[in-house]
Amino acid sequence: MLNTCRVPLTDRKVKEKRAMKQHKAMIVALIVICITAVVAALVTRKDLCEVHIRTGQTEVAVFTAYESE
């Protein structure tokens, strides 16, 4: 009969696995935030070529220039 035993993961490997899970969660969160921003801009604007955001005295303007061939 084959005798097998499980070797516990070292603390380093456990920490690496935890860090990878956190890294993946951060990437997913960033993607969700970006998609939400694009959808919000599409809902409030007709297109994404020009977006202005004003907060108090600060204004952020984003312009996209493109040419179709």
Swiss-Prot record:
Main localisation: membrane
What does UniProt give as GO cellular component? plasma membrane
Family matches, as Pfam families: HOK_GEF
Looking at the UniProt entry, the stretches that span the membrane are 24-44
| Source species, domain of life | Bacteria
Q: Which InterPro entries match?
A: Hok/gef_toxin, Hok/gef_toxin_CS
- The entry's keywords: Cell inner membrane, Cell membrane, Membrane, Toxin-antitoxin system, Transmembrane, Transmembrane helix
Q: Where does the UniProt annotation locate this protein?
A: Cell inner membrane
Q: How does it sit in the membrane?
A: Single-pass membrane protein
Could you tell me which PROSITE patterns the record lists for this protein?
A: HOK_GEF (PS00556)
Instruction: Give a short account of what the protein does.
Output: Might be the toxic component of a type I toxin-antitoxin (TA) system. Regulatory peptide which completely overlaps hokC and enables hokC expression.
**What is stated as this protein's family in its record?**
Belongs to the Hok/Gef family.
Protein name as catalogued:
Regulatory protein MokC
Please give the organism: Escherichia coli (strain K12)
